[in-house]
A protein has these predicted regions:
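Long, Lys/Arg- and hydrophobic-enriched amphipathic alpha-helices
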Residues: 1-160
C-alpha cells in the first residue's frame, strides 16, 4: 500500500483560506484528482501518452492526482468563522450548473455557423462534460469567505 502526501498543497490551501478570510473573496480550484487520497497516482506523461515516471528522467512530465480531501481538511482545520469550503463536484456537473448547455445552444444557433464549427463546439462540450472524458476526472472545489453577522445567506457559489 502506498500513500501520497503533499504538505506544500495543504500549506497553500491554508494560506489561501487565511487570505480570503482576511480580505474577503473566494477561491476556485479545478484540476484532476479525487475526493480522497488515492494512494499511488504518480505517472509520467510524454507526447500525450502515459509512460513510466522513471523513463527518460528530465524528459517526461510528472503528474499526480490532487487530493482535494486533504486541501479541504487543511482549510477547515483553521476553523475560520465565515469560511466555507464547497465541493468537490465533477467538472461536467460544475459546468452544467453554470449553464454550459445554454451557452452551447446559443453558439450552435448563431446565424452562419458551419457544420464544421458546430461539430467542433459539440466535441469540445462533450470532452469537457462527459463522464468518459474530463467530466468526472476533473473536479472543482471552492472556498468562500462570508462576513459574519451580516445579511448574507450561507449558500454555495454557482456551480456547487
Amino acid at each position: 500500500s502506498r500513500l501520497e502526501v503533499c504538505p506544500a498543497g495543504c500549506a497553500l490551501s491554508q494560506d489561501i483560506a487565511l487570505r480570503i478570510s482576511t480580505h474577503g473573496g473566494a477561491a476556485l480550484f479545478i484540476d484532476y484528482g479525487k475526493d480522497r487520497a488515492s494512494g499511488d497516482s504518480l505517472r509520467g506523461i510524454k507526447h500525450h501518452q502515459f509512460v513510466s515516471p522513471l523513463q527518460s528522467p528530465g524528459r517526461v512530465d510528472l503528474s499526480v492526482d490532487v487530493d482535494f480531501a486533504s486541501l479541504k481538511a487543511a482549510a477547515e482545520a483553521l476553523k475560520i468563522d465565515g469560511l466555507n469550503v464547497y465541493g468537490t463536484v465533477g467538472q461536467g456537473d460544475f459546468l452544467k450548473q453554470l449553464g454550459i448547455e445554454t451557452r452551447l445552444h446559443a453558439l450552435l444557433t448563431q446565424p452562419g455557423i458551419t457544420e464544421e464549427q458546430a461539430e467542433t463546439l459539440y466535441l469540445a462540450y462533450h470532452r469537457l462534460t462527459d463522464e468518459e472524458e474530463m467530466g468526472t476526472v476533473y473536479r472543482a472545489m471552492s472556498m468562500v469567505s462570508m462576513p459574519t453577522g451580516g445579511e448574507y445567506e450561507e449558500s454555495p457559489p454557482a456551480g456547487f
